[in-house]
């Protein structure tokens, strides 16, 4: 001990002696300076005066030539600069009293713990690669403790759970025990974990390549009876099979399996200090709620090694997902998009945007389905509820597109088929019973009813009027024939007002309906007769009729009668055409009403299907997930 103390003192003096000092009188000279050592006054005898402190020697510095490392000291020729006396100036903060106090404290330090550390870890008596045991046939009992600090991440796509945990591993090492009375009542010491033996306990279901890089270990605490406690923190990434059936309303149970990698139960007996994990320092996760955590000891026998049992500590972490994020970002948009597809049945077909709206809805559903598939694991073991709901919604939107095409064709069926009548069974069941059940009143519009009534009344009046006028003309010709001899010399200067009425009515009808009905021949006849009547009307008088002009009267009556017949025929054809157009309008209106009733029926059906899908795929499975009612889902 005295020798060690002397060596320590000499080293301290040497360090102090080599402290840089300022050199006086050596400006602009780049040379190396040799420092003088501290001189200690020699102690001649025990009775002589003892120096109370160390003094710094004073002297001149010897200057070495530049680039003369390792060479002997060379004296310079006397110059004027050497005449200046160089002095060693100590550091400003140097205190000789503090140095003396430090040396005295060093001499009074107790080295018992250091000596105990060296004696325990002496390589002649301790080998860290050898398993500690009293006899090699006895196992080393290792106690395992687990503290969960945080659930960092659940990677559903890669099926891995990342947790931050603290481990407490304890075992007995008889080689590290000592007698407290012989070592100043030292009860425990701390030793670096790399200096002693440690059990090779690892995470069996590890899912990361750099396993040991995530371990943060502290010093190992060793007590006097050989009890070793190893505390360390780690960021574990373990494989965890994800159950996606009820995603995003799912519960996940992940296991962390710890075991010795190379020692079976005959060498390392791994046990638990408690069956409940420590949650005193747990930090809540934003995505999962921790339901429960248990620790179980299992003894595993592998098929490849049936003669050995391997103790394993299984930490089961039960978590429940918080579905609020997924409800607002995945489910609510899907419900709204499905509702927009259903509301497409209420859009009038005349707008021509029903199909565009449903196709846009279908594309939106596809985009949201793609975002779902990127977040759930690509597994075929089960289909998540949200995926089933999206597929069902896509199917309903596709069906809505198909039935909207059918209803649009039905709406245009009356105009496309040139007046094809609605089948009788459709009129009876759809326009009759189904419309009544849907609380829809099928009545002809007032315009069609009034038009039909007016056309029918007008046709009756015209026909009776023409027949009456034809009879009147015939009677008039007979009367004129009888009185021809009596009025032979009388001249008729004015035309009968009835003829004016007939002529004006004929001209009005010809002007209002100039289209021919019977080809070019009828058009030529009407042209000649209209010229004749126009001349009669423009002149305002009949040609002078005398006894010698019977042929003119006969010609006029013949032409006039022929014109009336053709006018009657044209009016009749015009009425028939109007009746055909009215009938087509009525048929087209019936098809439109039929399409409206079908749209109302499909609206009710798709609303019911949408609500039924939400209840069956999103509500019932979450509420009754533990009942046998949902066993049908296992079929998929």
From Swiss-Prot:
GO cellular component term, pick one: neuron projection
Protein topology in the membrane: Multi-pass membrane protein
Residue ranges the record marks as coiled coil: none
GO molecular function, a single term: acetylcholine-gated monoatomic cation-selective channel activity
Cysteine-cysteine disulfides: 240-254
Family membership: Belongs to the ligand-gated ion channel (TC 1.A.9) family.
Signal peptide: 1-25
Positions in the Cytoplasmic compartment: 404-602
Domain of life: Eukaryota
UniProt cross-references to Pfam families, sorted A to Z: Neur_chan_LBD (PF02931), Neur_chan_memb (PF02932)
List of glycosylated residues: 45, 141, 179, 227, 284
InterPro entries assigned: Neur_chan_lig-bd, Neur_chan_lig-bd_sf, Neur_channel, Neuro-gated_channel_TM_sf, Neuro_actylchol_rec, Neurotrans-gated_channel_TM, Neurotransmitter_ion_chnl_CS, Nicotinic_acetylcholine_rcpt
Record keywords: Cell membrane, Disulfide bond, Glycoprotein, Ion channel, Ion transport, Ligand-gated ion channel, Membrane, Postsynaptic cell membrane, Receptor, Signal, Synapse, Transmembrane, Transmembrane helix, Transport
Extracellular compartment spans: 26-326
Keyword Cell wall biogenesis/degradation in record: no
Subcellular location: Postsynaptic cell membrane; Cell membrane
One GO process term, biological-process aspect: chemical synaptic transmission
Gene from which the chain derives: lgc-4
Alphabetical list of PROSITE patterns matching this protein: NEUROTR_ION_CHANNEL
Transmembrane spans: 327-347, 357-377, 383-403, 603-623
Role played: Acetylcholine receptor.
The protein's name: Ligand-gated ion channel 4
Family matches, as CDD domains: LGIC_ECD_nAChR, LGIC_TM_cation
Keyword Acetylation annotated: no
Organism: Caenorhabditis briggsae
């Amino acid at each position: 001990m005295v020798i060690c103390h002397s060596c320590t003192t000499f080293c301290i003096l040497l360090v102090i002696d080599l402290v840089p000092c300022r050199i006086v009188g050596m400006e602009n000279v780049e040379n190396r300076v040799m420092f003088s050592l501290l001189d200690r006054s020699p102690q001649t005898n025990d009775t002589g005066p003892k120096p109370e402190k160390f003094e710094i020697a004073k002297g001149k510095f010897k200057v070495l030539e530049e680039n003369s490392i390792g060479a002997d000291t060379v004296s310079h020729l006397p110059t004027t600069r050497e005449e200046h006396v160089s002095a060693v100036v100590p550091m400003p903060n140097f205190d000789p009293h503090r140095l003396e106090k430090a040396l005295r404290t060093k001499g009074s330090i107790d080295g018992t713990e250091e000596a105990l550390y060296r004696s325990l870890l002496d390589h002649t008596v301790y080998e860290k690669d050898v398993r500690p045991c009293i006899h090699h046939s006895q196992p080393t009992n290792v106690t395992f403790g687990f503290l969960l600090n945080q659930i960092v991440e659940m990677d559903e796509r890669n099926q891995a759970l990342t947790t931050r945990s603290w481990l407490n591993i304890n075992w007995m090492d008889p080689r590290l025990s000592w007698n407290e009375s012989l070592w100043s009542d030292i009860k425990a010491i701390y030793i670096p974990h790399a200096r002693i033996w440690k059990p090779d306990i690892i995470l069996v279901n590890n899912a990361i390549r750099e396993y040991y890089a995530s371990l943060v270990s502290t010093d190992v605490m060793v007590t006097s009876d050989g009890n070793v406690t190893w505390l360390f923190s780690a960021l574990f990434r373990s494989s965890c099979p994800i159950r996606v059936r009820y995603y995003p309303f799912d519960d996940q149970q992940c296991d962390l399996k710890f075991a010795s990698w190379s020692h079976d139960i005959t060498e390392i007996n791994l046990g638990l200090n408690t069956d409940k994990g420590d949650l005193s320092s747990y930090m809540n996760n934003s995505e999962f709620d921790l339901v429960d955590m248990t620790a179980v000891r299992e003894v595993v026998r592998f098929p490849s090694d049936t003669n050995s049992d391997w103790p394993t500590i299984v930490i089961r972490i039960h978590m429940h997902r918080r579905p609020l994020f997924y409800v607002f970002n995945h489910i609510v948009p899907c419900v709204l998009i499905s509702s927009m597809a259903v509301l497409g049945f209420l859009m009038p077909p005349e707008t021509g945007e029903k199909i565009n709206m449903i196709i846009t809805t279908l594309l939106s559903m596809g985009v949201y389905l793609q975002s779902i598939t990127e977040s759930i694991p690509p597994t075929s073991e089960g289909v998540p509820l949200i995926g089933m709901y999206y597929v069902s919604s896509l199917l309903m939107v596709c069906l809505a597109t198909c039935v909207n095409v059918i209803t649009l064709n039905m709406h245009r069926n009356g105009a496309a088929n040139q007046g094809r009548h609605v089948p009788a069974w459709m009129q009876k069941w759809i326009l009759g019973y189904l419309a009544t059940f849907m609380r829809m009143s099928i009545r002809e519009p007032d315009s069609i009813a009034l038009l039909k009534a007016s056309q029918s009344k007008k046709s009756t009046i015209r026909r009776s009027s023409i027949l009456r006028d034809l009879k009147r003309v015939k009677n008039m010709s007979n009367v004129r024939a009888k009185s021809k001899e009596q009025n032979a010399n009388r001249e008729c200067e004015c035309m009968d007002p009835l003829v004016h009425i007939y002529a004006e009515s004929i001209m009005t009808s010809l002007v209002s309906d100039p289209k021919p009905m019977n080809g070019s021949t009828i058009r030529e006849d009407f042209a000649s007769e209209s010229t004749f009547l126009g001349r009669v009307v423009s002149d305002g008088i009949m040609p002078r009729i005398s006894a010698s002009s019977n042929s003119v009267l006969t010609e006029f009556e013949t032409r006039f009668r022929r014109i009336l017949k053709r006018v009657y025929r044209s009016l009749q054809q015009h009425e028939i055409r109007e009746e055909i157009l009215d009938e087509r309008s009525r048929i087209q209106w019936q098809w439109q009403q039929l399409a409206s009733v079908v749209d109302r029926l499909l609206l009710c059906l798709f609303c019911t299907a949408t609500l039924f899908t939400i209840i069956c795929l999103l509500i019932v499975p979450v509420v009754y997930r533990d009942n046998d009612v949902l066993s049908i889902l296992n079929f998929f």
